[in-house]
């Protein structure tokens, strides 16, 4: 009976692992299209910008006995290669730099989140919000 249970367990684990590796349940870390809001305090408008950002699932591990060992570092989906594009906001006050730069993800990877260059927080309630009126019909890439 134990041999039959062991064989059944082996069969379930081997089939489940093969299926999971071919068809991930969640999309893996990759560049996706996104719309960002670009505005400055001394400029009267907000412009939406189409760009690519990094998003998706990164495999992580957690220790079973957390009190006994140090926690494992957790990874996030972050930029591997990135370039910065710029747009110029219209109607800014004199002396205010009207240029706003935004990231364009060329490739992504799973790695540690560096707070100096990335927003390491979770999902935002309102990712596209503007304090100033939104300029209609202008989308930049």
From Swiss-Prot:
InterPro entries: Cystine-knot_cytokine (IPR029034), Glyco_hormone_CN (IPR006208), Gonadotropin_bsu (IPR001545), Gonadotropin_bsu_CS (IPR018245)
Signal peptide (UniProt feature, chain positions): 1-20
Annotated SUPFAM superfamilies: Cystine-knot cytokines (SSF57501)
Keywords: Disulfide bond, Glycoprotein, Hormone, Secreted, Signal
One BP term from GO: G protein-coupled receptor signaling pathway
GO molecular function terms listed in the Swiss-Prot or TrEMBL record: hormone activity
Glycosylation sites: 33, 50
SMART domains, A to Z: GHB
SS bonds (residue pairs): 29-77, 43-92, 46-130, 54-108, 58-110, 113-120
Primary localization: secreted
CC annotations in GO: cytoplasm; extracellular space
Subcellular location: Secreted
Quaternary context: Heterodimer of a common alpha chain and a unique beta chain which confers biological specificity to thyrotropin, lutropin, follitropin and gonadotropin.
Family membership: Belongs to the glycoprotein hormones subunit beta family.
Protein purpose: Promotes spermatogenesis and ovulation by stimulating the testes and ovaries to synthesize steroids.
Protein name (Swiss-Prot/TrEMBL): Lutropin subunit beta
Gene: LHB
């Amino acid at each position: 009976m134990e041999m039959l249970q062991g064989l059944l367990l082996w069969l379930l684990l081997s089939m489940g692992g093969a299926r999971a590796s071919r068809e991930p349940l969640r999309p893996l870390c990759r560049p996706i299209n996104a719309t960002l809001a670009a505005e400055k305090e001394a400029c009267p408008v907000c412009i939406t910008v189409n760009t690519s950002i990094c998003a998706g699932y990164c495999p992580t591990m957690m220790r079973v006995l957390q009190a006994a060992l140090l926690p494992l570092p957790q990874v996030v989906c972050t930029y591997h290669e990135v370039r910065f594009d710029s747009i110029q906001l219209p109607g800014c006050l004199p002396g205010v730099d009207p240029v706003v730069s935004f990231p364009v993800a060329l490739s992504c990877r799973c790695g540690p989140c560096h707070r100096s260059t990335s927003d390491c927080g979770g999902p935002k309630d309102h990712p596209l919000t503007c304090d100033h009126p939104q300029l209609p019909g202008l989308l930049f890439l």
